């Protein structure tokens, strides 16, 4: 909770000390070559710091797809906090249209992909932790739309208030059509949760509905 509040005021200098990247240069190299990158992450450790610190280490604006919340004042406050180092926030309901309109300008997109999609929206199903689980369809169609490299961003707590981040390649542009990117994401997500179950946000209502509820 303290770190969440700290997200609103932490300086770029302090954040760089607290979140260490081992291979973000690989992403910058792709962007320098005008190649697109999609980063899939999760509610592991401090995802707010992960996104903020990523922007500080990237040479292009990070486009973050997010789900808005009903309280407009809190939503505006979160947008202000998340974008203060240059990231661009894209509301999930408008994401597809925004990306299609701006596809030539967009270099890198991030999505916290373990969130539960809205019940009425289209979704894909995979088994996560022995539970039939709904995921955003965008995890499947965005790599093909963008013709992007796809990375899984994993975060690990080193000590109190200090983390390391690693980017694992899931797919490349020439693999996207034939690869089950969502299944690979779920596999990496489950492995991460099992390795450090105490660092995943179990309270974010991941299994709010089943296939039978749809």
Each predicted region: which residue ranges?
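Short acidic/polar alpha-helix capping motifs at helix-coil junctions
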Residues: 15-17, 42-44, 61-65, 102-106, ...
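Membrane-anchoring hydrophobic helices of lipid-metabolizing enzymes
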Residues: 1-41, 75-76, 80, 86
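A short linear-motif detector with a strong N-terminal bias
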Residues: 17-18, 43-44, 67-70, 88-90, ...
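Non-catalytic C-terminal accessory region of glycerolipid acyltransferases
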Residues: 29-32, 36, 56-57, 93-214
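Short hydrophobic/aromatic-rich motifs at helix boundaries and adjacent loops
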Residues: 22-24, 48-52, 70-71, 110-113, ...
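Catalytic core of membrane glycerolipid acyltransferases/transacylases, capturing the structured
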Residues: 35-93, 118-127, 131-133
């Amino acid at each position: 909770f303290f770190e969440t509040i700290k997200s609103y005021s932490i300086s770029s200098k302090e954040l760089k000390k607290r979140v260490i990247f081992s291979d973000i240069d690989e992403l910058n190299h792709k962007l320098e070559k005008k190649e697109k990158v999609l980063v899939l992450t999760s509610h592991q450790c401090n995802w707010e710091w992960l996104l903020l610190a990523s922007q500080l280490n990237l040479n292009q604006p990070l486009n973050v797809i997010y789900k808005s919340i009903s309280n407009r004042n809190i939503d505006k406050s979160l947008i202000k906090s998340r974008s203060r180092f240059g990231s661009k926030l894209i509301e999930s309901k408008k994401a597809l249209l925004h990306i299609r309109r701006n596809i030539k300008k967009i270099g890198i997109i991030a999505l916290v992909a373990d969130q539960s999609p809205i019940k009425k929206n289209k979704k894909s199903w995979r088994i996560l932790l022995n539970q039939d689980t709904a995921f955003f369809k965008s995890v499947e169609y965005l790599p093909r739309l963008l013709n992007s490299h796809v990375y899984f961003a994993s975060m690990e707590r080193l000590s109190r208030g200090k983390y390391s981040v690693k980017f694992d390649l899931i797919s490349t542009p020439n693999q996207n059509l034939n690869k089950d990117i969502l299944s690979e994401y779920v596999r990496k997500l489950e492995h991460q949760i099992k390795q450090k179950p105490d660092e995943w946000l179990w309270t974010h209502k991941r299994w709010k509905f089943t296939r039978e509820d749809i």
